[in-house]
A protein has these predicted regions:
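Short, small-residue-biased leader/transition segments that mark boundaries at the very start
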Residues: 1-4
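Surface loop/turn signatures of beta-propeller and other carbohydrate-active proteins
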Residues: 15-58, 73-74, 88-110, 119, ...
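Hydrophobic core segments of beta-strands in well-ordered, beta-rich domains
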Residues: 55-71, 107-123, 128-130, 146, ...
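Short loop/turn segments that connect beta-strands within beta-propeller blades
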Residues: 84-88, 133-137, 192-195, 247-249
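Blade-level signature of beta-propeller repeat domains, shared across WD40, Kelch, NHL, RCC1
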Residues: 235, 240-249, 268-312
């Protein structure tokens, strides 16, 4: 039950799926499993990897790249990458981006012939864009902070799961924040250039909802239709993924409607506890879909380390906790 889960550590794992192009990429029941990545392999490690999540796929020439968040129990998340040319043999996963603060949601894209990444950097109070500095996509440099938290503007959660969609020469940026009510609030900005000044859309916030207010991947155009994936957070964080079709997107208009709820079927054991990411590409004449899923583990030493960390914080800062 829920009481038992509160005594456990919430973890995430990744699963890559393949589907025929004739099948809807939203129907994971028609897929077969390509690859899985899990944490918790270092059973005797004091700082084990507990989260591998937020997978994003990116195709460059004949190579498929998988970027994802990897987080250990006591340290902030970093961005890792692995790649393949045949879907069978994958390169050794490498840390490609690390900061002093938490990183996740590594959305990778191209613009004007260059490769960029917009990871989640909300704990820094900003939305950042990094540029790849080599052809292997293993090195990245900060190019610009697109948006920064205004002075004195207090959010309970700032700038999460951000991505950009270019349409008719305009760059539309979506990001999720939470204000005093702790409800997921989807904000929309736009600019006439990737590195330009982003102004808030007149209809922003465009969504205020625990059901569809937080993105679960980037916007994707499939068979001529533009889709947005969102997390179901009604009962708990990252419970499942919904799909909405965006029917109007201009500098003055925005419309979307829900087309599919709960992509992850509870009939599939891997997704028993839900998931919060959905991303796809066409590669080798099929759909390749990146998903993640939640799981819970009772790690005694992890609970001890958490309590020790809290004790040390209280000792150093008497008012803590």
């Amino acid at each position: 039950g829920d009481v038992y889960k509160r005594q456990m550590i919430e973890c995430f794992k990744i699963q890559l799926l393949a589907l025929p192009l004739k099948v809807s990429p939203f129907d994971v029941r028609e897929s077969y499993v390509l690859k899985r990545i899990t944490g918790l392999s270092e059973w005797f490690c004091l700082n084990p990897t507990i989260i591998v999540a937020d997978p994003f796929l990116f195709v460059d020439k004949d190579r498929l790249y998988l970027f994802y968040e990897s987080k250990r129990l006591l340290t902030p998340g970093v961005i890792m990458m692995t790649s393949t040319i045949d879907l069978k043999h994958w390169t050794k996963p490498l840390v490609v981006l690390k900061e002093k603060f938490h990183l996740s949601f590594p959305w990778v894209f191209t613009d004007a012939g260059k490769v960029y990444m917009v990871p989640e950097t909300g704990t820094d109070g900003s939305i950042r864009v990094y540029e790849a500095t080599d052809d292997t996509l293993t090195r990245w440099k900060l190019k610009r902070k697109l948006i920064e938290l205004p002075p004195g503007n207090v959010m309970n959660m700032g700038y999460s799961d951000s991505s950009i969609y270019k349409k008719d020469g305009i760059y539309y940026l979506m990001t999720t924040v939470q204000y005093e009510d702790d409800i997921n609030t989807l904000e929309l900005y736009y600019s006439d250039s990737l590195m330009g000044k982003y102004v808030k859309h007149p209809l922003s916030p465009i969504v205020h909802s625990q059901n569809v207010g937080r993105n679960a991947g980037s916007l994707q155009k499939i068979n001529g239709k533009l889709y947005r994936f969102s997390q179901n957070c009604v009962f708990r964080y990252g419970d499942n993924v919904h799909v909405s079709e965006i029917t109007r997107l201009t500098t003055t208009e925005y419309q979307e409607h829900l087309v599919k709820e709960n992509i992850y079927s509870s009939e599939i054991p891997f997704y028993n506890e839900g998931g919060h990411q959905f991303n796809m590409v066409k590669f080798k004449e099929q759909w390749i879909v990146a998903t993640d899923a939640k799981e819970y583990h009772y790690l005694l030493y992890a609970r001890i380390m958490n309590k020790l960390k809290r004790f040390l914080m209280c000792f150093r800062f008497p008012d803590f906790g």
